[in-house]
């Protein structure tokens, strides 16, 4: 079985080794056919505490790590401009 992958934006990094990633899902409304966007928030494991708020990341499904974590950060696609300013 293939592992699920999602692309999203980090919206919280306050927890140790955990980030909250918001993934936007767009789909047509079944009756009115208007494009509807729904945001789902996933808690993902960030082993190195490398992600910051605003980063674009790819998360993959994994074994349950805790009660609410079933995803892990596979890679950071782009860092947010704010995170780059703070680190320099």
Curated annotation (Swiss-Prot):
It comes from the Bacteria. One of its GO terms (molecular function) is structural constituent of ribosome. The keyword Nucleus does not apply. One of its GO terms (cellular component) is cytosolic small ribosomal subunit. The keyword Ribosomal protein applies. InterPro entries: NA-bd_OB-fold (IPR012340), Ribosomal_uS17 (IPR000266), Ribosomal_uS17_bact/chlr (IPR019984), Ribosomal_uS17_CS (IPR019979). Keywords: Ribonucleoprotein, Ribosomal protein, RNA-binding, rRNA-binding. GO terms for biological process: translation. Belongs to the universal ribosomal protein uS17 family. HAMAP family: Ribosomal_uS17_B (MF_01345_B). One of the primary rRNA binding proteins, it binds specifically to the 5'-end of 16S ribosomal RNA. NCBIfam families: PRK05610.1, uS17_bact. Part of the 30S ribosomal subunit. This is Small ribosomal subunit protein uS17. The lineage of its organism: Bacteria, Bacillati, Cyanobacteriota, Cyanophyceae, Synechococcales.
């Amino acid at each position: 079985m293939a592992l699920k992958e999602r692309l999203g934006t980090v919206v919280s990094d306050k927890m140790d080794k955990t980030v909250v990633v918001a993934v936007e899902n767009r789909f047509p409304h079944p009756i009115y056919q208007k494009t509807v966007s729904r945001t789902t928030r996933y808690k993902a494991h960030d082993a190195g505490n490398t992600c910051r708020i605003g980063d674009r990341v790819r998360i993959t499904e994994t074994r349950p790590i805790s009660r609410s974590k079933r995803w892990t950060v596979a890679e950071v696609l782009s860092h947010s401009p704010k995170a780059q300013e703070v680190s320099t």
